[in-house]
């Protein structure tokens, strides 16, 4: 069964995109078929994985509006992940979706049509149609599980879909949360970084009550963590206490490798064994085990 994970926080600069790319790459290393969905009009995930957002012929924009089938927009990354890319056109899609009934379900409907076939295009110039064995993509059942991309004849479904939500509480983020089985909230370990967390958690509660009753909040993921400072530890203690929110382990340490990876068009895992990459690998393995057996995710208790 395909698992759909949303990575979301209304605040920018908290390593959402890095988390999506790194978890995806780590799961590919573990033999999983992974689809990444870029829901940010800035196209940061798309750019960080070596695609040029300005040269895309089709993207998630057309997919959400129903103008093209999802398979038409998929591209393959150099690290074996499949990407549904985004560019600035997506900002226009957000405005158009606001005028449509059922706008929160646009992504869920689209993911139900994804065939799981390997996309043909690997360059940054747009996506060629993926093979669907001439049968089209049969929508999968979505009862109680978010949007599960279905397999067509001769293809296999994705094991995991990871959604990079934009830094806002608008209709695109609502689409990501409505389509997801689970959500992780990346949280930079600084005092100002957790301002607005309460509002975001209320949004998750609204989604659970209105559009996705099965959405599970897994917890906050500490990012840009510096174990040498008491400030980072104090922030995590405050978040856990104030919001009664699990703080996931391991924390993602601050490392210059994150910026270097984005500039090179690859994930932080590509050819590297730095502490950040190892932390994401550990979290990816824990998530897969949680989805397989229900084993609880480890939580982080800062030493004080």
Stretch-by-stretch model annotation:
Residues 1-304:
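P-loop NTP-binding core
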